[in-house]
Each structure stands twice: as C-alpha cells, then as structure tokens.
C-alpha cells in the first residue's frame, strides 16, 4: 500500500515537470510556419495579378500597388494601382460629365485614368472595366460622419461597365478610392499641411550653410543604418532564435523604407485620458510615412469627428483592421501625441507621430519594426565578385522575416509576451526607427532647401543609406532587390564580403596561372561547359552502333534457336490388363 502511494505521487510530480503538447504539435510553431510562408503584405508572396481577388480578408496599400490577403490561401496578392494615360496633358471632359459625375470611383474599376476640365472644374475620367459595390461601416458602431453617411470604401458606378464616367478630382471626406488618384491627392494635401504646421512651430533660420553630401569610403556605412542593424542583431542574441545571430545575413530592402507596424500591446490606452495625460509622450512631428500593418485583427481605434472641411486634416480611415472599440477624440483641447516608440496608423496605412487638434479620421496605435529579412549562415548565397566560369542555375533564397525571427508574431497572436523576449523590449528598436525616420526626413528637407543640383543626390539617398554593392567593393551584398549585411556573434562584420572577394580573387588567379585553363587563347573557360554534352554525344556515336548490333545479334540468335528446336510429343504405352484366362485354349 505504501509503495502504491509513493508511485502515485511520483506520477503526479512527473506530469507537472514535463509539458505535453496535445494534438499534432505546438500550435505556435504552426502559426509561425504559416506566417513565414505567407510573408509580409508588400512582399506579395502570392504574386502579382491583373485584377483584385474576389474574396479577400484585408487590403494594405504599398505605394504603387495594393496587397490583398486572399481568403483561400492567405497569401498576399498584389495589384498595381492605375496610372494616368497622359500625366502632362489635360484635355476636355466628355459631354456626359455635364449631366452626371460621381464623388469617387474605386481604383480597381479602371486601368488608366485621365484628367480633364469642363466649366473651370477639373474631373477624372476613365472607362469602367468591372462592377464593385461600395463598402460601408456597421450601423451599430460610431462612425465619423454619422450612421447616415458612413461610407468608407468607394465602389464602381452601377451598370457602367464599358462606359466612360467622370468623377471629382478632389477627395471626399473619409472616403477612400482604394489607393487611386484621390487618395494620392489626399496624401499631398496632408503632407503640405504638416509641413506648414512644422514650419509654424519650428521656424527656419534665414541662412543655411550649403549641405554637401559626405564622401564615404567603400567600407563605411551610414551611422543610422549601422545602429539599426546593431540593435536588431542584439535583439536576435536574446531572442528564442538566438542561434541565427551567430551566423546570418541581415537584409534591408532597397528603395524607400516601409517599416512593419504591429499592434501596440498596452491595455492602458483603452481610454482618452491615456493620451492627454501621457508622461512618456513626446510630440515629435514627422512627415507621414508608409508602413505595413501586420497582425491587426481587432483593435482599439481612435476617431475624431468631421468639423470643418476647409480646416480639418483628413487622415483617412484605418480600413486594414476591424475596430473592436472606439475612443472619441473629437475636438481635443491639445494635439495628440503618440507614446514613445509608437505611432498612429491611419488611412492608407500612413503613420503619424503627431495629430493636431483639427485632425479627423480613425487611427490605431502601433509599434514599428524595420523591414529586415534574415538569411541563415548555412544558406548558400551568391557572391557577385567574379564571373562564373560554369553556368549554374540560380536557386531561390529563403528569407526569414525579422518579425518571425524574433518570435513576435506568435507572442502577439497568442496574447502573451512569450517566446523568448517580452514585447516591451522592442520599444527601443521602434523608437530608434522613428528617430531615424525623423533624421532622414530632416536631412532630406535641408538638402531640398539648398542647391538644385543636389536634388538627384537627395533622391538617390532617400533612404539615408550608403548602400554599396559587392561589385563596388562595399559591405552590402545585393540579393533580390535587398541589401544584405553579414553578422556573427560579435556583431556586424564590415569586411565579410571583402574577404570573400579576396578568396575568390585568389582562386581566379590560380586558375589563370594554370596553363591548362588558359589554353586555346583563353577560349577554354567558354568551351568547358560544352565538354560534358559533347563527350556524352561522342560516346553515344562511338559505342552506340556497336551496342545496337550486339543487341540485335542477341535477339536474332534467340529467335533462331526457338525456331530450330523440334517439337517433342510426350507419350507412353498403355498397359493391358489380363482379365481371366487366355483367349486361345489348346486341347
């Protein structure tokens, strides 16, 4: 009895020590695998399509194209935004513009559009290619314009497919055309108002010294970029995927940066007093910049009512998430400042660090992460330092998004701070990224205010990065429109590519010094890829007829031996039985 008692308690203790996952494995690992497969919105893992999918969960604006999360595969498919047929020419509007025009038309309703004028008013005109119903807000939640005017996303004119229609060039308040020309006009208007606001709060000096770009060596990197990469690498060192930090490549996307926006994990921001009595809020005014909303499902949304069309700053509606609850910030007495390390993400997924008193629209609070991908060191990467003598097919490189490498996606999805590092530890990286955006925008603005000849330099350095590719002897390795930096246990290795290039250069010199390799006046490297197929063809032509004749002879002998073989009939004598006596009886 005593033995059974101890045995029972031993089983209880062991069951508490070892964690058992029921089912087919850890669901967090499955979620991580799914998110890695689907990728980020602007990566377009589902490819580029000509028309938007019929069923999609959410949409994300990516500047020149729109990403759709397809229902059946959950991969992001991208559709290019329509372009103007003639950007410099404004013609006359069709006659039907006099009788009928629309407030807004969705960008997926046409492929190209054109500006036109009639009666001193500018319209947009295009030929409709599809039908689409407008989408409205729910009647049981607060809306910006009230329940009677809660239109959010414009649609296509009804029964106008194949016909030319006209609509206003100026955007309507709180109505989006899906990343079309009206949304672009709204962004320009908002940017100008923020520039005016910034100049009024921080007056410029009357004299600016000439700002010339700093000449950097081939092995130098922009300070902001290096600090950002170093911070990311330090986070990898303390995350659940710390083995990646020992040997990996950190890849930045070339072009304008589009950071990832994650839901702000703070339950204290569920009421308006959190924003107006915020002790860690700094009113840092930055121009609105594009972000990629990631893992937004049900969020606490901020909204401000429409007040006056001539003075309000319409930041649009956050259509990439479902608002589970709303916080009314209408007619605030003071500007709204985002807490440190966070931003307001509003319509067309534009991020703001500061919202003035006359803003209107709806936004959500988010934390930023840089759009950085990781390549494990075990993954072979091409080093474009020398010409390859033998043709090799290019293989796809498997990039791991930073948000997955740090284990943030599973922590956000499960509502925990688990998988290695708490979400609060990423605030430093988000704050650094926001400050970097501010520094880049300030530098660009200073350069734009100077000599016109620097305009091209400004555009080339829009990112604030000095990205020199491997062909130029720099520290950046260009892979699939990304710039990759090598890192190990000690941090970012500045001379990794240079060492690889030196090794490859030594091998090339060894090949050049080999007389066999330099034979035929240097034509041998180009003949070598053909030697394999030529040798195979020569072997076939040489031994093919012999093998064929041997095979035919063998088959012929087999047939002849079968034909010459006599047919044997197997039989045996029948035994006679003796019944009774003899048939002849001699007397």
Swiss-Prot record:
PTM description: Specific enzymatic cleavages in vivo yield mature proteins. Envelope glycoproteins are synthesized as an inactive precursor that is N-glycosylated and processed likely by host cell furin or by a furin-like protease in the Golgi to yield the mature SU and TM proteins. The cleavage site between SU and TM requires the minimal sequence [KR]-X-[KR]-R. The R-peptide is released from the C-terminus of the cytoplasmic tail of the TM protein upon particle formation as a result of proteolytic cleavage by the viral protease. Cleavage of this peptide is required for TM to become fusogenic.
Sugar-bearing residue positions: 120, 237, 266, 271, 277, 280, 295, 308, 322, 328, 340, 358, 488
Membrane-crossing residue ranges in chain numbering: 528-548
SUPFAM superfamilies for the chain: Virus ectodomain
Keyword Signal: yes
GO BP: fusion of virus membrane with host plasma membrane; symbiont entry into host cell; virion attachment to host cell
Positions of short motif CX6CC: 476-484
Membrane side Extracellular: residue ranges: 23-527
Keyword tags: Cleavage on pair of basic residues, Coiled coil, Disulfide bond, Fusion of virus membrane with host cell membrane, Fusion of virus membrane with host membrane, Glycoprotein, Host cell membrane, Host membrane, Host-virus interaction, Membrane, Signal, Transmembrane, Transmembrane helix, Viral attachment to host cell, Viral envelope protein, Viral penetration into host cytoplasm, Virion, Virus entry into host cell
Placement of sequence motif CXXC: 248-251
Chain positions of motif YXXL motif: 571-574
Disulphide-bonded residues: 248-251, 248-484, 476-483
Sites marked Cleavage: 395-396, 569-570
Region annotation (Fusion peptide) ranges: 399-419
One GO CC term on file: viral envelope
Role: The surface protein (SU) attaches the virus to the host cell by binding to its receptor. This interaction triggers the refolding of the transmembrane protein (TM) and is thought to activate its fusogenic potential by unmasking its fusion peptide. Fusion occurs at the host cell plasma membrane. The transmembrane protein (TM) acts as a class I viral fusion protein. Under the current model, the protein has at least 3 conformational states: pre-fusion native state, pre-hairpin intermediate state, and post-fusion hairpin state. During viral and target cell membrane fusion, the coiled coil regions (heptad repeats) assume a trimer-of-hairpins structure, positioning the fusion peptide in close proximity to the C-terminal region of the ectodomain. The formation of this structure appears to drive apposition and subsequent fusion of viral and target cell membranes.
Subunit structure: The mature envelope protein (Env) consists of a trimer of SU-TM heterodimers attached by a labile interchain disulfide bond.
Protein name: Envelope glycoprotein
């Amino acid at each position: 009895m005593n033995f059974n008692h101890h045995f029972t308690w031993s089983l209880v203790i062991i069951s508490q020590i070892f964690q058992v996952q029921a089912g087919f494995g850890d669901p967090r690992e499955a979620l991580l695998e799914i998110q890695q497969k689907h990728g980020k919105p602007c990566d377009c893992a589902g490819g580029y399509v000509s028309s938007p999918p019929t069923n999609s969960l959410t949409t994300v604006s990516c500047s020149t194209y729109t990403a759709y999360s397809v229902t059946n595969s959950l991969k992001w498919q991208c559709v290019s935004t329509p372009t103007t047929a003639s950007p410099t020419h404004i013609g006359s509007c069709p006659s039907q513009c006099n009788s009928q025009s629309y407030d807004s038309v969705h960008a997926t309703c046409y492929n190209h559009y054109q500006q036109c004028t009639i009666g001193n008013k500018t319209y947009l005109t295009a030929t409709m290619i599809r039908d689409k119903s407008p989408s409205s807000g729910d009647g049981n939640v607060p809306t910006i314009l009230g329940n009677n005017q809660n239109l959010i996303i414009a649609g296509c004119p009804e029964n106008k497919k194949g016909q030319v229609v006209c609509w206003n060039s100026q955007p309507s308040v709180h109505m989006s055309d899906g990343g079309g020309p009206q949304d672009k006009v709204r962004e320009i208007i908002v940017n100008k108002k923020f520039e005016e606001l910034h100049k009024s709060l921080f007056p410029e000096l009357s004299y600016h010294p000439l700002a010339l770009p700093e000449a950097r060596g081939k092995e130098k990197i922009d300070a902001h970029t290096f600090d950002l990469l170093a911070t990311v690498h330090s986070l990898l060192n303390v995350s659940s995927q710390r083995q990646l930090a020992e040997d990996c490549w950190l890849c930045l996307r070339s072009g304008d940066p589009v950071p990832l926006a994650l839901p702000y994990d703070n339950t204290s921001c569920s009421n308006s007093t959190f924003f107006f009595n915020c002790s860690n809020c700094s009113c840092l005014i930055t121009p609105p910049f594009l972000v990629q909303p990631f893992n937004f499902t049900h969020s606490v949304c901020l909204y401000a009512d429409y007040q006056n069309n001539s003075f309000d700053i319409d930041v649009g509606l956050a259509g990439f998430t479902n608002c589970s609850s709303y916080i009314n910030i209408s007619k605030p007495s003071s500007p709204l400042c985002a807490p440190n390390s966070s931003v307001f993400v509003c319509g067309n997924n534009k991020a703001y660090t500061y919202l003035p008193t006359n803003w209107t629209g709806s936004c959500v609070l988010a934390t930023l992460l840089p759009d950085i991908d990781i390549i494990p060191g075990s993954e072979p990467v091409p080093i474009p330092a020398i010409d390859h003598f033998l043709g090799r097919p290019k293989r796809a490189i498997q990039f791991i998004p930073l948000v997955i490498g740090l284990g943030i996606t599973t922590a956000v999805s499960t509502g925990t701070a688990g998988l290695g590092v708490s979400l609060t530890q990423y605030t430093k990286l988000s704050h650094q990224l926001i400050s970097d955006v501010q520094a880049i925008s300030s530098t660009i603005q200073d350069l734009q205010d100077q000599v016109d000849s620097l305009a091209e330099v400004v555009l080339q350095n829009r990112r604030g990065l000095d990205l020199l590719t491997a062909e130029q002897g720099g520290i950046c390795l260009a892979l699939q429109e990304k710039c990759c930096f090598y890192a190990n246990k000690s941090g970012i290795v500045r001379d990794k590519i240079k060492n690889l290039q030196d090794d490859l250069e030594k091998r090339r010199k060894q090949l050049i010094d080999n007389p066999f390799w330099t034979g035929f006046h240097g034509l041998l490297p180009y003949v070598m890829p053909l030697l394999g197929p030529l040798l195979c063809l020569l072997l076939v032509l040489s031994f093919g007829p012999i093998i064929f004749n041997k095979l035919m002879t063998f088959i012929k002998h087999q047939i002849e031996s079968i034909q010459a073989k006599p047919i044997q009939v197997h039989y045996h004598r029948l035994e006679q039985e003796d019944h009774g006596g003899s048939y002849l009886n001699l007397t």
